[in-house]
Amino acid sequence: MAIKKIGISARCDRPEIIGKVREILAHFSSRVQIFVATPTAEVLGMEGTPVERMREEGVELIISVGGDGTVLRNIAKMKDPLPILGINMGTLGFLVDVEPEDALETIEEVLYGFSYSDRMRVDVFLNGEMLETATNEIAIMSAKPAKIIQFEVYVGDCLLDSMRADGVVFATPTGSTAYAMSAGGPIISPRVNAIVVVPVAPFKLSSRPWVIPSDSEITIRLSAPKKEAVIAIDGQKSYRIKLDDVVKLKKSRFPARFVRISDTCFYERVQRKLT
């Protein structure tokens, strides 16, 4: 086989997902070395390896068993993400291409060699300190429910817009089918290097979604005193910001990597998921 070492990481709170992991381990453990992520291994009663250490162990790809959230959590643990193959045990699943009944056959094919697509990510900085890297989106929302915030968005040195809104979403092409789409933003092909800026329930009708080049440096500042906001990164981690804070977004040097499945067409897949 071309692939010698793989990793596997799963959502651990659903028995059917753990059952699928056991099935994968039983089928492939004698043919390829499998490193099981620590939380998953604890449920299985075996020795585990942190996802963030799998690259140094020589792992060539990670099988993520769960939904989109599981994929995002796995990617977030790695500075330079390994290729991910997602097994869809969730609901909609834009980041998980393989259905449970096809898992063994697909993994069998992938073990003989695979290609992957790079997906841009965005580094998030607060007052010059890097917080996280987003694969899907950065959402900035009011810290208090049902309250609007006022903020300015700059692209480079140019003011893009001064907004009063419930918030704003900055999405990668990968994240354009998530929160940004629900807020009225466009769907962007992952082959396009761009960042989508989508106001959430803006006060003025002239505040519209924008698509800007991925190499742009974006700056966000709150402009109303005594109001705080929250930055949510991929729906996983959040940070509070206040009036004098400066948020900057920059394209990351380290993309996410998704294993290509031969019969996968982005446009057909999106249409299928949305119907």
From Swiss-Prot:
The keyword Lipid metabolism does not apply. The keyword Secreted does not apply. Its cofactor is a divalent metal cation. Its EC number is 2.7.1.23. One of its GO terms (molecular function) is NAD+ kinase activity. The active site is at 68 (proton acceptor). GO terms for biological process: NAD metabolic process; NADP biosynthetic process. Its main location: cytoplasm. It comes from the Archaea. NAD(+) binds at residues 68-69, 73, 136-137, 147, 164, 166, 177-182, 201, 236. Keywords: ATP-binding, Cytoplasm, Kinase, NAD, NADP, Nucleotide-binding, Transferase. It catalyses: NAD(+) + ATP = ADP + NADP(+) + H(+). It is found in: Cytoplasm. One of its GO terms (cellular component) is cytoplasm. Belongs to the NAD kinase family. Involved in the regulation of the intracellular balance of NAD and NADP, and is a key enzyme in the biosynthesis of NADP. Catalyzes specifically the phosphorylation on 2'-hydroxyl of the adenosine moiety of NAD to yield NADP. This is NAD kinase. The gene is nadK.
